[in-house]
Amino acid sequence: MSGKSKSAPKIVVVGAGAFGTALSAVAAAKDKANVTLLARREEAAAECRRTGRNDAVLPGIPLPPGLVYSSQAAALEDADIVLFAMPSQAHRDAARSYGPAIGARAIVVTCAKGMEQSTGQLLTDVLEEELPGRRIGVLSGPGFAADIASGLPTAMVIAAPDTAIATELAEALSGRTFRLYPSADRTGVQLGGALKNVLAIACGIVEGAGLGDSARAALISRGLAEMSRFIVARGGEADTVRGLSGLGDLVLTATSHQSRNLRFGIALGKDGRAAAGSSELVEGAFAASVAARVAGALGIEMPVTEAVAAIVDGKLDVRSALEQLMSRPITHE
């Protein structure tokens, strides 16, 4: 990519969901942009070509005329930057499927906010396993797809171990109303995005159960403490927790009804427990299970996360979880 600094990098966004579409729209709005949105189904790509929109996920929002739509893996050939914008649990299969078409010099960026449930791995670790030799980054922070695609001011974080690469990515992907801050803390940025979804579910449960705003405030602050302990124990930086990908994303996701994780929690709070065999699990539901398991193995105290995991798994109802949290031994904050 550095060798093509005078021309626009070729960017391919894999995943034509709301977030992938929004990111492709921002990137394609720049001068001399070379951006392709890669959909899983040709029907989806064809509809975007026909209408200039992706009404299935972002109804009524026009997309830049220069944005290219495809469903063919060949679109990845010679890509400088590849954004993986599919759900966390689909990353490994997508990497295996598209990997042969991704060049050795490409930078691959995960844009999902979760961890792999079966292994507990960070998504960058999954991509490094499946795409050996590629440089891997992560994009995260407080940004809803509809806001980004509509041109509302949004700031997020892009992280890579090499700060020069993170800066290069930030410059390539930032737009007039979309600002990316580079970071070298790939671990902290990823875990902030995953754990804030868990805490958003907890805040939704509080809202759905009618427990009041004071309880929500307590969950946000105590949840932030849990997030910090977990991130630092996993090798991330405490400063990251206080930034956009930690506190910033937590505040947004735990307070806005645009958040699927918050809405999922509200439904849990109203019903008392998760529906058995629910197929509508959100990222935070998977992350809660993984984080609780890893925290137990590492001896990290995360009572809110453990309670969310137990409720989602149907092992505990909301009232019992609340009683457990409120009856914990009194300790210094």
Curated annotation (Swiss-Prot):
Catalysis performed (reactions): sn-glycerol 3-phosphate + NAD(+) = dihydroxyacetone phosphate + NADH + H(+); sn-glycerol 3-phosphate + NADP(+) = dihydroxyacetone phosphate + NADPH + H(+)
Pfam family, one: NAD_Gly3P_dh_N
Main enzyme class: oxidoreductase
GO molecular function: glycerol-3-phosphate dehydrogenase [NAD(P)+] activity; NAD binding
PROSITE patterns in the cross-refs: NAD_G3PDH (PS00957)
Positions of NADPH binding: F19, R40, R41, K113, A145, R260, V282, E283
An annotated GO BP: phospholipid biosynthetic process
Transmembrane segments: none
SUPFAM superfamilies in the record: 6-phosphogluconate dehydrogenase C-terminal domain-like, NAD(P)-binding Rossmann-fold domains
Subcellular location: Cytoplasm
Pathway(s) served: Membrane lipid metabolism; glycerophospholipid metabolism
Superkingdom of origin organism: Bacteria
Main location: cytoplasm
Enzyme Commission no: 1.1.1.94
Physiological role: Catalyzes the reduction of the glycolytic intermediate dihydroxyacetone phosphate (DHAP) to sn-glycerol 3-phosphate (G3P), the key precursor for phospholipid synthesis.
Family named by the database record: Belongs to the NAD-dependent glycerol-3-phosphate dehydrogenase family.
HAMAP family linked: NAD_Glyc3P_dehydrog
Protein name: Glycerol-3-phosphate dehydrogenase [NAD(P)+]
Origin species: Rhizobium meliloti (strain 1021)
Gene name of the record: gpsA
